[in-house]
Amino acid sequence: MPVKKKRKSPGVAAAVAEDGGLKKCKISSYCRSQPPARLISGEEHFSSKKCLAWFYEYAGPDEVVGPEGMEKFCEDIGVEPENIIMLVLAWKLEAESMGFFTKEEWLKGMTSLQCDCTEKLQNKFDFLRSQLNDISSFKNIYRYAFDFARDKDQRSLDIDTAKSMLALLLGRTWPLFSVFYQYPEQSKYRVMNKDQWYNVLEFSRAVHADLSNYDEDGAWPVLLDEFVEWQKVRQTS
């Protein structure tokens, strides 16, 4: 989860690099070597007071964990801000804005996770990652990411932010991702709305990499119809 400098900034969820003329995303998406978490005794019960004190280690005077606090928090737990585990954590905290945790979000979410210190959260990393392997949970995380990443004064995601979030969520698992990633560069699309966003996930799950089972009469958004048409032309050229 990238650290935003302003609440209104869309942020970027993945670093992108040139490779052989095609843009490939370099994302620390599912794992990164973290310092081993200290084993927590089963007798150390969750403490709301301790959780609140932990929050104030990172919060500013406005009682919000902002960019600087988020950077320190990520350093302490041993996770890069753009690691997908931060998106899953934000989902668990029901955070509204990328790069920010309010006190209410922190206390509600960490209470749900029963985490009141760094070590307990590190011991939850495997659980957080497991949410990505559950079809229902992943769908919820994917849908959450749209509102989480968009500017709150906009109804759609700008296309660069959409591409970065798609890279984070689908870059490792969708065979057509690298092709779809290139498509907006030569298309008319500069934003992605919620319906398009939702349907990209369904498309990635339902349609074969060779597009052989794509139903032109299906209820897909025009964006995906045009993507398929564009890709078929490329395949035959």
UniProtKB/Swiss-Prot annotation:
GO biological process, one term: regulation of cell growth
Primary location group: nucleus
Protein purpose: Contributes to the neddylation of all cullins by transferring NEDD8 from N-terminally acetylated NEDD8-conjugating E2s enzyme to different cullin C-terminal domain-RBX complexes which is necessary for the activation of cullin-RING E3 ubiquitin ligases (CRLs). May play a role in DNA damage response and may participate in cell proliferation and anchorage-independent cell growth.
Entry protein name: DCN1-like protein 5
Disulfide bridges in this chain: none
The entry's keywords: Cytoplasm, Cytoskeleton, Nucleus, Phosphoprotein
Annotated GO MF terms: cullin family protein binding; ubiquitin conjugating enzyme binding; ubiquitin-like protein binding
Residues annotated with Phosphoserine modification: 9, 41, 48
Domain note: The DCUN1 domain, also known as PONY domain, mediates the interaction with different cullins. The DCUN1 domain mediates the interaction with the N-terminally acetylated NEDD8-conjugating E2s enzyme leading to the NEDD8 transfer from N-terminally acetylated NEDD8-conjugating E2s enzyme to different cullin C-terminal domain-RBX complexes; the neddylation efficiency correlates with the DCUN1D5-cullin and DCUN1D5-E2 interaction affinities.
Pfam families: Cullin_binding
Gene: DCUN1D5
